[in-house]
Amino acid sequence: MFIKQVIIEGFKSYKEQVATEEFSNKVNCVVGANGSGKSNFFHAIRFVLSDIYQNLRSEDRHALLHEGAGHQVVSAFVEIVFDNSDNRFPVDKEEIRLRRTVGLKKDDYFLDGKHITKGEVMNLLESAGFSRANPYYVVQQGKIASLTLMKDIERLDLLKEIGGTRVYEERRRESLRIMQETGNKRKQIIEVVHYLDERLRELDEEKEELRKYQQLDKQRKSLEYTIYDKELHDAREKLEQVEVARTKASEESTKMYDRVEKAQDDSKSLDESLKELTKELQTLYKEKETVEAQQTKALKKKTKLELDVKDFQDRITGNIQSKNDALEQLNTVEREMQDSLRELEAIKPLYESQVDKENQTSKRINELEKTLSILYQKQGRATQFSNKAARDKWLRKEIEDLKRVLDSNTVQEQKLQDEILRLNTDLTERDEHIKKHEVEIGELESRISKSHELFNTKKRERDEEQRKRKEKWGEESQLSSEIDKLKTELERAKKNLDHATPGDVRRGLNSIRRICADYRINGVFGPLVELVDCDEKFFTAVEVTAGNSLFNVVVENDDISTKIIRHLNSLKGGRVTFLPLNRIKAPRVNYPKDSDAIPLLKKLKFDSKFEPALGQVFGRTVVCRDLNVATRVAKNDDLDCITMEGDQVSRKGGMTGGFYDHRRSKLRFMNIIMQNTKSINEKEKELEDVRRQLQVIDQQITQLVTEQQRLEADWTLCKLQVEQLKQEIANANKQKHAIHKAIEYKEKLLGDIRTRIDQVRSSMSMKEAEMGTELVDHLTPEEREQLSKLNPEIKDLKEKKFAYQADRIERETRKAELEANIATNLKRRITELQATIASIDDDSLPSSAGTKEQELDDAKLSVNEAAKELKSVCDSIDEKTKQIKKIKDEKAKLKTLEDDCKGTLQDLDKKLEELFSLRNTLLAKQDEYTKKIRGLGPLSSDAFDTYKRKNIKELQKMLHRCSEQLQQFSHVNKKALDQYVNFTEQREELQNRQAELDAGDEKIKELITVLDQRKDESIERTFKGVAHHFRDVFSELVQDGYGNLIIMKKKDLDNDDEDDDDDDGGREAVTEGRVEKYIGVKVKVSFTGQGETQLMKQLSGGQKTVVALALIFAIQRCDPAPFYLFDEIDAALDPQYRTAVGNLIRRLADDYGTQFITTTFRPELVRVADKIYGVFHKNRVSIVNVISKDQALDFIEKDQSHDT
């Protein structure tokens, strides 16, 4: 084993982490300038090996931390890596890392990263060969110097330390201490024995007086016993009488208490009922307010609907009257229309005839006037034109103008014909449009009627659904009220059960529920109280039998219970007892065949899989009719028995009983919890079903209302469309009338155009006929005759035309009046009256009135229902009020009964207190006389009956006389005999103890002798080994020299003349009163091999250092270590000895495989080193690097020249 590597961080001058290269397993040398950190490097290794820096205080730890520039180092560590290939450390690893970390508040060791204690480190190092008795595997600066200055006695102490004689000395000192304590005890024992002997002589003289005293004392005790016994018997008789009276009063008090308790329970029950009734009454009052509000609302709605229906009826009656009036007016207007049409039809032909006559006359007049004009023009052509050609030219021009006029009139004629044709087409289209709209109106009116019918149907369905919803609301309210009531009772029962459950058990059960939920643990069935049920009359028996076992939790197997217990412990969540079904077995019990004793287990209801758990708790218990039966069964059948009242008789003989408060029954609370939980679940399911039905009804109502709104919107739209279509028909009729007017006007214009065309054509034909004729200045006879006839004829025609015109205007005026009356009055009035009649016929008033009447019927039904409901609520209020009054009366009676019972109870309590006080007095008296009898001590057999027949007064007189006689012996030591016996026993015991101490003293003396012998043997053995190795090592270090170690004895001191002046040889060693055999170790050496040997004080400094080194190497050879640390051991050596030391180290490393780590300022150790490390220092921070041998020698040479 050897040190493989050293890692330092934050330790003294080593700030940053420094990890050395692996050390050689032979010779390693460390060089560096003074103050560079070589010694700190050695201190770091010793810091881990714990030979220094063992018990560090805070300031010591702070001194080990690096102090320099930059941030402060708060912790440091040194880690040594050991090569353990030879397994010197008892660890199955080839490499071991031992680290020591130090901080301001810590000092820890780590082995391969795991924390270990300081003691474990020391044991580990000792197991590897590091002896606490031999610390010379580390030689620090100054150790050599101290060895050179050692006195002979100090060298002897060194040998003792190396040889381990300290153990012998410690054991010897402990033995001497024990001997001293034993001597002290022996002295004390001798003094006590001497005192006891004197007291025994005195007590022997007092025994005779004591005998006489004892005879009188025997008589006194006998008298006192008889008096005490009689008094005790009297007290017991009185106590029995008091107990009988107290039992009777207690029974009566119990009855009164039961009556008070029953009255209180009944009162509480009445309070609960009163509370519920008050709550129900408040609910009824609220319901009454709601129903009254509904009734008021229904009455308002009914009144409004009645007014609406009356309004509709009035409007319908008015519409019927209006329709009749309109029909009458329509008939009148239609008759007038027919008359006007007939008159118009009669006038039209006459008018047209007159117009035709007028037109024909006008046409004839125009023709004649034209002829007359032509004749006049022809007659004046000769004067107008100079020749025929000019005339023809003019005629041609006239003909062309007429032709243009003709063309223009022809175009106008064609245009008028086209317009008339278009107007006729428009008229036909308007007729078709009107027919189409009338068909659409019929369809829309049919659709409106169907929508009204469907709307009324949907309304009835909606009203029915609303009625159903109202019923469901009532059910929902009722269920919610019942659930709230059940939950209140459930919470009360849970709270009462919690109060009846021990606190740690309650917390445990709550913790189990959370643990099972959080960690998803299955197989937990719950406490027994939740798994068992029975008839209510067995509740007391079951609870008293089980006790807190009712809260034992049944689980499927013990793995589950183990897991839960682990969680309970970690959470500190209370305590619970588990019953794993895979572990428990129900006991096999033979029950008695007795009708008065029934197995309790048979009266329980539970799941068969829980039978082992319940059998373990209740299997050995039977329910008995009374305590007599229970006592008999428990004794004969070895079973636990219990009565229905909860009185127990154990099979082991014990009896337990008394009052049991049934109001705190755990099973009753659990029964309420289970039943209410079941009822709540059922009610909540019903409530959920009702709410689901309400949701469906709400959806249906919403759907029906939506459908009603759609139908209402549809018929409203249809009405708007009908009105629009009727308006379009009216507009079309107006347009038809306008078109008729336009056609008449266009036809008249067309007739005028055609007349003008004929006139133009006639004029053109006349002018064309005149062309080419001769130009004459006079007319022909025929023309003159014609001219003479034309004027009269024209005049006559004009007169006729005037007559025709006058007649035509008259007829035209009448015709216009008729047409205007028909068009603007009669037709409009007919249309209006028809529209009025149609609106009355098509009016939705009857339908709306029917709807309103239906709504009125519904409103009347709602009013009746509200009245019935209000009456029902009022009846319920009256009933609840009567019940409340009845409960209050019952409460008053119960209060009176309770007060009477409490008064009786107070009297009984007072009587019981008096009896109890008397009982305590008698008990105290009984205890007093019992204690007095016991205080008399053991009595002779005749003492019980000697004075039995005497009365108390005689006994007291006799006792008085006996007491007077005893006063004569008042000076007698009453404990003389006891003291004599006691002192005799104490003397024998002390004498035995003295003998034991004497024997122990001899054994301790033998042990001290053995220890002294073994100590001397150890010193001699160690000295021989060290002396032998010293001679060898000295001869190796000093050529031709020799040296010896001489151990000095007491006899040598007296005969040694050579050392008379030696200051270290004249002290006599004394250890704990014993003169030591050895008093010192001398060193005698010769460096030349010739002449006499020299003592240490006769040597030079270098020679002393050689001797000290030889002694160190000798000690090391006696107790070899795996490696050695030398810190500048060659500092004071002469060069030839430094070479010898280096060669010795080299030889030890090669021959024995020992590792050396040395520091030096000299070249000799560097030359023999296998690996050399340089320590450098910069900015108060040290680092360690491997350097070559030449670099090390150069550094040493420069350092020595610098020192020079």
From Swiss-Prot:
It holds the Pfam family SMC_hinge. Mostly expressed in flower buds and leaves, and, to a lower extent, in roots and stems. GO terms for cellular component: chromatin; chromosome, centromeric region; cohesin complex; cytoplasm; nuclear matrix; nucleus; plasmodesma; spindle. Residues 190-420, 474-502, 673-744, 803-1009 form a coiled coil. GO terms for molecular function: ATP binding; ATP hydrolysis activity; chromatin binding. One of its GO terms (biological process) is meiotic cell cycle. PANTHER family: STRUCTURAL MAINTENANCE OF CHROMOSOMES PROTEIN 3 (PTHR43977). Central component of cohesin, a complex required for chromosome cohesion during the cell cycle. The cohesin complex may form a large proteinaceous ring within which sister chromatids can be trapped. At anaphase, the complex is cleaved and dissociates from chromatin, allowing sister chromatids to segregate. Cohesion is coupled to DNA replication and is involved in DNA repair. The cohesin complex also plays an important role in spindle pole assembly during mitosis and in chromosomes movement. Essential protein plant viability. Required for chromosome segregation (e.g. This is Structural maintenance of chromosomes protein 3. It comes from Arabidopsis thaliana. The lineage of its organism: Eukaryota, Viridiplantae, Streptophyta, Embryophyta, Tracheophyta.
